[in-house]
């Protein structure tokens, strides 16, 4: 199993460059938005939300990558693997390290651009950029792409395209109702443990379904 994990990590290592655009694209979006707010002299308190928005975008992009890896690479590599657990663990670790790398790059870029912005707009303190993000949110965001990938790939394996479409419409519904659940989470960040716990339980089911996936 250890050999399979190491082999999988080495095989996927060339794809680590994908963490760069996954991190920098949201940072650029946030930077443009911040400059527009500064130029129009709107309420600087709006800047408090921007890093959170950028982090969400980065995590969403990493979730997409996690789904792609577990839905496409897992069935492909399963044909050459004697250890399903090792293969699944290797892909999950690869997704995790890519997400952590993207978060680090995004955090460094945001701080660097925040320092530059502070030079031009002194009333926007750099420290305010991180006031709205609790510390425990970062590790939660790091594991989200792994959990989402396991759920999505597991549902596709167990229920086929029908299950995938159901998840897709549930995701769309969640995005359109963001105004109803984002404010409670922003006011009480600890409540994030409930949806994450439910997602983790579904991810366990997804992993079990992947363990029973047929070799194509």
Predicted features, each with a name:
Residues 1-75, 85-216:
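Hydrophobic alpha-helical transmembrane segments of membrane proteins
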